[in-house]
Amino acid sequence: SCWKWYHPPVFQKKSKQIINKESSIDGVRDYLRNAVDRQMLADVPVGAFLSGGLDSSAIVSFAREKDKDIRCFTIEAQGEKEKGTTDDLQYARRVAKHLNVSLDVVQISSTKMASDIELMVKTLDEPIADPAALNVLYISQLAREQGIKVLLSGAGGDDLFTGYRRHYALMTEHWWTWLPIKIRNTLCNVSSKLNQNNLLGRRVTKLFSGANLEGDERLVNYFSWIQRDDLKK
């Protein structure tokens, strides 16, 4: 056999290529529709995850053009929710009603998730602290029980369309990265003393935790869950 390193295609911008906003929007719509069309080609029923967010909603919208009876699935987390978090169910129901598609709701509890943590750790190939993988498991189990073995997902859309908070953090940098390093050090130190039990406090601390770093190091810091100093302890 022959092995070869995979090299992903790199976009080569033509020097005279001019793309306006309207053309960009139409292009993204066409590419996304074609991608969904390809995934709808299956010899088994196809369903979809639906959180009510932009990514999954767009995918379901295009999928419905091929199958008006497509079944969608979402999660309802029972119990008290963390302050500052959003319940996807209300948005998923609004989108399902707007698109006139069926929506199955999987109800889960923190007790159920806690009991399945060990299963998640054994199943995944790498250490991941995000329990969202369990949501995928529960939805997939229900879908399979109903005879649906293929589910379309909007996972990865936040990376492609800059939907994470770290992308917004990068957008704020022009307001403060020009400050002298001593002032940025102060921002870093002061923000670290904010109340970490408060969602806003944690996010401000995260934003300025790399204020004393430069360029690429600051970008890496936005992607990190554990600070370097904590790793050294």
Regions found by a protein language model. Give the residues of each.
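ATP-dependent adenylate-handling active sites, centered on carboxylate activation for C-N bond formation
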Residues: 7-233
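Active-site-adjacent helix-turn-beta-strand microarchitecture at beta-sheet edges
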Residues: 1
